[in-house]
């Protein structure tokens, strides 16, 4: 059997004519029925506004909030654009507006609240704005409060009207600006607490006069500030009658009867008033006069300079010159002032008499000074040949640079040996020195501010 090839033709059934007529008239019937029911139940008019429902108060409350944010009167906007609405919804909107602190009659803007709660704002984190409490406040179990937003920067200055600047006749002081409160008249009548209005004259700042080198004053009337009251204090003498003249009591009573005026703060102490005070030198002289009269100050005693003749005894030096330094006491001190002059030979021999002693004090033979000698004198030993430390003890001169102690003849630890040409830099820098001679004393001493020479008597 051979199979068929090609597509098979399908014949669709055609609906009967009755059903076609019913489907065409169905749409028309539905429209007619809709119009009939609308006419019967609607009174022939379509409703302009929707009927109030349970959701209308909430819808209009949010609309009222948006209207209040832009600053429009809520009641007028509802009456003009929304028409007559449910009284319950209008009462709800009015109550909400009253809670926000906004008056419908005035139409003022209410306070602006923060977008984040106070807790999140303080922590500087993003607030989730969940209601009634955000997630962070709910977690910490604290109250979620939205505070009033504050304007950043400096606060705005309050504008005062010009009516507040007018002064009252009872003398009250108003807190207005200085420019509006100042009077332009030259001689105003200041406000008095006693009811009187005296004319006060204040002196202006003095004007310098270059001709005589003095300072002159220019007295003229000065404008008074409205905030500067004057006190009228009348001090009357008990014996003064009502008709008595004020001049009879002298200028003191006249000055007491004059009104006392509070001058503005611009007036400083005038130079004429400053010149009325005596100078400082005269004040010190007046202060010193009674002190001088009670306790006269005597001249200070003059400081006597060391006189070498005061140290010279009555007797002259006698005996061998070998015992020149044998009479040196342990505690004897010789001061060397800077004003010492060059001594001659006779004065040097007289100075030797101070150091005479017997041979028993050989272990404590020394002469010392308590005054600082650095930069005043220096020392040198001349004529002591063949002398040295540990070699020959004849004719040696030891100078101790340490503290003043009892130094024996054999103790050399605190002393330095002086030869023919010694180095005296360390000795000159010391504060105290001691001289000790063993066997061959010097026969002559010469002293000047720069050098102390010890020589043999050849």
UniProtKB/Swiss-Prot annotation:
Query: Which cellular compartments is it found in?
Result: Nucleus
The record's region (Disordered) falls at 153-256, 435-458
Q: Does Ribosomal protein appear among the keywords?
A: no
Q: Where is the composition biased (Polar residues)?
A: 167-186, 193-207, 223-235
GO cellular component annotations, sorted alphabetically? nucleus
Q: Which PANTHER family match?
A: MONODICTYPHENONE CLUSTER TRANSCRIPTION FACTOR-RELATED, OLEATE-ACTIVATED TRANSCRIPTION FACTOR 1-RELATED
The name under which this protein is listed is Transcription factor verZ
State the species of origin.
Clonostachys rogersoniana
Q: What is the lineage of its organism?
A: Eukaryota, Fungi, Dikarya, Ascomycota, Pezizomycotina
Q: Which gene encodes it?
A: verZ
